């Protein structure tokens, strides 16, 4: 009944050259991230499938999570498949559930870390979809204990840093036992540094809690990182007088320098990674080198 059309009965051999995606640049007004507020991104799927597909999209940025942790987060999202959280913007629910789940394991992200790994969440400026508003809504819907995501407890933020510099032999999900001494040391430095700023009336009280924490953590991280690079270059050691109870584990930092550098470079790419020269100079006074 039907006869093939000669012009369409063709065979073609297509050869693709090597393409480096990292070297491509976006066009003007082109955005590498897209989150639809009013339409379903995966309209042919159920809302549950849509959340899991969205989670896959977001979690690829958290390069330091292993397969067990990623699987655990997928199971957490799957556990709330029958819960209607938002009428619109369903896919944005997935990263919030991931953040709250990771926080329940003792790891939180500063504003700069959120911008680095979840820029869609950080750059949301509407009142309804702002970060703190969404956290409160999802906590209520899922039965989590309500409260602010950002609090003056520095250990969870440095626990995320510890996750990023773990070696490949860590056992258990979100396990940072080998790096726990680093978490304690960085936290102690930050607490004492924060108290110094309080006594000197240098804390900007008009800023949000998240902004103050972000400034403190960023200052400590970049200062320790720069001191570490100098110590590696000169084969020396350094100490911080603010780390009284938990000295900085310099050997651990040197051993994990490549991973630490990768994490710091991710933070440096963000617009919120701004360091006050005054704060940094104040903190530098408490660092000394051992050149012997």
UniProtKB/Swiss-Prot annotation:
Induction details: Expressed in the early phase of the viral replicative cycle.
Keywords assigned by UniProt, alphabetized: Activator, Early protein, Transcription, Transcription regulation
Role summary: Acts with RNA polymerase to initiate transcription from intermediate gene promoters.
Family to which the UniProt record says this protein belongs: Belongs to the orthopoxvirus OPG134 family.
Subunit structure: Heterodimer of a 45 kDa (A23R) and a 32 kDa (A8R) subunit to form the virus intermediate transcription factor (VITF)-3.
Annotated protein name in UniProt: Intermediate transcription factor 3 small subunit
């Amino acid at each position: 009944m039907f006869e093939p059309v000669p012009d369409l009965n063709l065979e073609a051999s297509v050869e693709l050259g090597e393409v480096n995606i990292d070297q491509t640049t976006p066009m003007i007004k082109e955005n590498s991230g897209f989150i639809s507020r009013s339409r379903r991104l995966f309209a042919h799927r159920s809302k549950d499938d849509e959340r899991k597909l969205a989670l896959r999209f977001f979690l690829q940025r958290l390069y330091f999570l292993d397969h067990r942790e990623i699987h655990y987060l997928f199971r957490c999202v799957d556990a709330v498949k029958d819960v209607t959280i938002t009428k619109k913007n369903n896919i944005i629910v997935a990263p919030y559930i991931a953040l709250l789940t990771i926080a329940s394991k003792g790891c939180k992200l500063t504003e700069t870390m959120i911008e680095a790994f979840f820029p869609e969440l950080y750059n949301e400026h509407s009142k309804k979809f702002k970060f703190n508003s969404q956290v409160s809504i999802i906590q209520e819907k899922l039965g989590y204990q309500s409260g602010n995501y950002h609090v003056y407890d520095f250990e969870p933020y440095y626990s995320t840093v510890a996750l990023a510099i773990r070696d490949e032999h860590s056992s258990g999900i979100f396990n940072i036992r080998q790096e726990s001494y680093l978490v304690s040391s960085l936290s102690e430095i930050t607490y004492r540094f924060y108290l110094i700023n309080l006594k000197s009336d240098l804390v900007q009280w008009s800023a949000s809690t998240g902004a103050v924490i972000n400034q403190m953590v960023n200052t400590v991280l970049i200062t320790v990182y720069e001191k570490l690079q100098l110590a590696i270059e000169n084969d020396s050691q350094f100490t911080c007088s603010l780390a009284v109870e938990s000295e900085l584990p310099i050997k651990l930092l040197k051993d994990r320098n490549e991973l630490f550098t990768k994490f710091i470079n991710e933070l440096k790419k963000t617009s919120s990674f701004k360091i006050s020269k005054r704060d940094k100079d104040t903190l530098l006074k408490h660092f000394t080198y051992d050149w012997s």
